[in-house]
Amino acid sequence: MHVRCHFFGPLREVVGKKTVEREVAPKTTVDYLLTTVADDHPGLEDLLFENEELRESMTVTRNGTHVIYQNGPDTELETDDDIRVTPSIQGG
């Protein structure tokens, strides 16, 4: 299955481009996709994960719907899914 993963803000800087396209097996989860992409881009894992869990400060959507309204990081991907990963903006 073909999926696209779009990165924004500092995540895009680490990845070096806006979109990463992947071929994944059926039943692949959002969490597994992000883990494999992070494996290919040094520094991305520290931005995405804390204690092997997706950081709460990350907004992850699948086809425009936040994954928390689906099955969280365990949401299974389907062909031509668009995953968007955006860090929360924090400041004072």
Regions found by a protein language model. Name each.
Residues 1-91:
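Ubiquitin-like/PB1-type beta-grasp interaction modules and other compact soluble beta-rich domains
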